[in-house]
Design a protein with these regions (language model features):
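Conserved catalytic scaffold of divalent metal-dependent phosphoesterases
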Residues: 9-14, 86-177
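Short, Asp-centered acidic motifs that coordinate Mg2+ and/or phosphate
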Residues: 48, 163-165, 193
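Core catalytic region of metal-dependent phosphoesterases/phosphodiesterases
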Residues: 2, 16-112, 178-191, 214-215, ...
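Generic enzyme active-site microenvironment
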Residues: 6, 52-53, 81, 167, ...
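Short, hydrophobic/glycine-enriched beta-strand segments
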Residues: 2-8
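Active-site environment of divalent metal-dependent phosphoester hydrolases
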Residues: 10-17, 57-62, 84-92, 111, ...
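Short amphipathic alpha-helix with an adjacent loop that forms part of the alpha/beta core around
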Residues: 40-41, 153-157, 233-234
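Short, basic/aromatic-enriched C-terminal tail that caps enzymatic domains
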Residues: 216-234
C-alpha cells in the first residue's frame, strides 16, 4: 500500500460550470484525460492519494458532485482538503457520507499507510506584500486549525509510532526565505514532510518554497507542476 499526493485538479464536468483549463497553457492541455491516464497507471485500489484542495470549479456542492464522483471512480482512497477555490465545500458530515472512497479532512488527523495526515487550507502569510488586517484574521484562524489537527496527530502518534505528514493548500510561506506560523507549528510537532498546492506557472514554481527548510521538506504537488503525475510519498 502506497501514499501519493496531487492537488489543484480544477475539474469542471458539470454542464453548469464552464472553466476550460487549456487556456492556462500547454501543461493544462487535456488535463483531465492526462490525469486519468497517469493515475490509473500509478495508483492501485489499495493505495491512498492526498488531494490538497482546488478540486472543482463548482460554486455549489451540486455543481462539484460530478467532479467528486469522477475522483471517487479512480483507484485508491482519497483524502481531500479544502482549497482556495473550493467554494462548494459545505457540511463536511454530509459530504463524508456521499462517496465510497473519499474522506474530506478538516480540523482533524487521519491515520493512513502507517502515517498521520493532517493540515488545513492555509492562507497568505505576513511576509506577503499585499497582506492586510483582514488577511491576518484568516491567517491566525488557519494557524489554529492546523494546530488542532497536529494535536490530534500527535495523540495518535503516542499510541502508535508513525510519521506526521502536513498538508496545506497555500504555500507555508509567501517568500522562500521568510518564516511563518505554519512553519513554526510544523517544527513544534516534529513534522518532517509537508505537501501543498496553489502555486501555478513557471514563475510561481521558481519562487515558491521547495526542499528542506528548518528541518522540514516542502513539496509542491499542484497538478501542473507534477504534469499530472501523482507524487509518491510512501
Amino acid at each position: 500500500m502506497s501514499l501519493f499526493a496531487i492537488g489543484d485538479l480544477h475539474l469542471s464536468i458539470s454542464n453548469d460550470v464552464d472553466k476550460p483549463m487549456d487556456i492556462y497553457g500547454p501543461r493544462w492541455a487535456g488535463h483531465m484525460e492526462n490525469l486519468e491516464k497517469k493515475w490509473q497507471a500509478t495508483v492501485k485500489v489499495e493505495d491512498t492519494v492526498i488531494i490538497p484542495g482546488d478540486v472543482s470549479w463548482g460554486l455549489k456542492l451540486s455543481e462539484a458532485e460530478p467532479d467528486l464522483a469522477w475522483i471517487d471512480s479512480l483507484p485508491g482512497r482519497k483524502l481531500i482538503f479544502k482549497g482556495h477555490h473550493d467554494l462548494w465545500w459545505n457540511g463536511i458530515t454530509r459530504m463524508n457520507k456521499m462517496f465510497e472512497t473519499i474522506t474530506f479532512v478538516q480540523n482533524k488527523a487521519v491515520a493512513c499507510e502507517g502515517a498521520y495526515i493532517c493540515g488545513t487550507r492555509g492562507w497568505i502569510t505576513p511576509d506577503n506584500d499585499e497582506y492586510t488586517e483582514a488577511d491576518d484574521r484568516i491567517y491566525k484562524r488557519e494557524c489554529l486549525r492546523l494546530e488542532l489537527s497536529l494535536q490530534e496527530a500527535a495523540l495518535m502518534q503516542q499510541e502508535k509510532q508513525g510519521e506526521i505528514i502536513g498538508v496545506l493548500h497555500y504555500p507555508p510561506v509567501s517568500k522562500i526565505n521568510s518564516f511563518s506560523g505554519f512553519q513554526q507549528l510544523f517544527m513544534d510537532y516534529g513534522v518532517r514532510r509537508v505537501i501543498y498546492g496553489h502555486v501555478h506557472g513557471e514563475e510561481g514554481f521558481r519562487n515558491t518554497i521547495k526542499g528542506n527548510y528548518h528541518g522540514t521538506d516542502y513539496n509542491l504537488v499542484s497538478y501542473d507542476y507534477l504534469m499530472g503525475q501523482p507524487l509518491k510519498l510512501l
